[in-house]
Structure formats: C-alpha cells, structure tokens
A protein has these predicted regions:
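Extracytosolic ligand-binding ectodomains
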Residues: 1-241
Length: 241
C-alpha cells in the first residue's frame, strides 16, 4: 500500500511490510505548525479543536506537546463530532476563552464549517488548520470573506515553485475541471510510487512478480516526480517529506 495523506505515526510504526507513505508524519507536521504559530504569527495563547478521529486527534496531541515546549499556552483541546454541522458548543467555548488563535486538527468539511461559525460568532482569533484542510473547498464551505486571513498546512510545495509542478496543476484542472490541492498532488505521487514499484518488480521477475517480490521492490523504490524525489526509510516513511 502507498498512501498519499495518512499522516498518523502508527501507519509506519507497526513494522508492516509493503507500506509506504509519501506525505509527512504528524510528529513532523504538528511541531512545525506550532513553531510557525509561535515564531511567525506571534501567538501566545491557542485553543485546539480536533475531530476525535485518528488524524485530527493525533495532530492536536502532537501540536499540544510541541506548543508547550515552545512556551505557547494551550487553553483547551476540545473535540467535535465528525459529520456534524453545528459546532456552537465549542464555538461558545472559544468565544469565552478569547485565544490569540484556534488550531483545528481534522479534515476540511468540519474544519471549514468551524471557521465559518467562529467568524459568524464575531471571533477574530487567527485560524490555523492542519493539512486536512488543504483544499479549495475551504473557500466554498467557509466563504471567501471568512477564508481570507486563515492559515492551513499544505503537504505540497507552492504550485508556482517550479514550472513542472505548475504545468501539472494546469493539466489537472483542464482534465478534471477541479482545482488542484494537496490531496490531488500527493495521491498522484502515491500512484507514481506504486506504479514504479510494480514496474520494477515486473522487470526483475521477468513479467510475473509474486507479492513478496512487489514488496521487495517497494522497499528500494526511488521516484523522481513533480514535487521532487521520493525515497523511503526502513519504516516506509518518505525521507524527503
């Protein structure tokens, strides 16, 4: 299996063979986000909201640990229920706490609605979302006026950081009719890694590789793709994430 967006550390910490991750891990993403909040945004107090799922809860747990080391005051770490649409209970808690920022760990449907509802409540705290919010749907759900000034972590480089990536983004939009985002890019990269692994296994086996041969090929695969070079450590994590 090759995953494009599974950031929970347990994905590659279980010793599974044939498991590769092209994106970053929670224990890299969340501390980097906390550092950004402290050093770039100048935040002193922050309210954490998670979706009570493996991804969101893991992000907030790692963020909280890093934030405390940096001297950020975490005023709360509250959960919301995935697939719900009314977050008034936690929004009221945020309003009462009046933090410098709100950090959301989870995916974009709930994260976008949370942003809309805290702005509708008149809360002006800076909004920072995890990589699960990295999609154009944030603007569609939260509203353009609410998305302005919001931050979220992106797994992918900036689209205009290279001509190759920008060309891919343009082709993706022309072909699919959808706006490219971090999900699209890293699922493409995951497919590229999987196909290269299969191709290498087929070549090595003379046409019909066994499962074990495919797993072996995955362990040594190296791919030059649109966002850079993909190589993996003994756990299956991307060395360049």
């Amino acid at each position: 299996m090759v995953t494009g967006q599974s950031t929970n550390v347990d994905v590659t910490e279980r010793g599974l063979k044939g498991m590769l991750r092209v994106c970053q891990r929670d224990d890299f993403e969340a501390p980097a986000t906390a550092k950004f909040c402290k050093e770039t945004l100048g935040i002193g107090t922050i309210f954490l909201v998670n979706d009570q799922q493996a991804f969101g809860a893991g992000q907030c747990e790692a963020f909280e640990a890093a934030a405390k080391e940096l001297g950020l005051e975490v005023v709360a770490n509250e959960g919301i229920v995935s697939n719900e649409v009314d977050f008034s209970a936690v929004v009221n808690q945020i309003a009462a706490a009046n933090p410098d920022a709100v950090y959301y760990g989870g995916n974009y449907p709930e994260g976008s609605l949370l942003l809309k509802q805290i702005r509708d409540k008149g809360i002006t705290s800076i909004y920072v979302g995890s990589s699960g919010v990295d999609t154009a749907e944030l603007v569609n759900i939260a509203g353009k006026e609410n998305a302005v000034g919001a931050y979220y972590i992106s797994s992918s480089p900036a689209f205009d950081s290279s001509a190759v990536l920008q060309e891919w983004v343009d082709r993706y939009q022309q072909t699919s009719g959808l706006a490219a985002d971090g999900y699209a890019i890293y699922f493409y990269e995951a497919a590229a890694v999987a196909l290269e692994s299969l191709s290498n296994a087929i070549d090595a086996a003379g046409g019909k590789p066994t499962r074990a041969q495919v797993v072996e090929a995955m362990a040594g695969v190296q791919v030059e793709s649109i966002t850079g070079t993909f190589q993996f450590d003994e756990k299956g994590d991307n060395r360049n994430a």
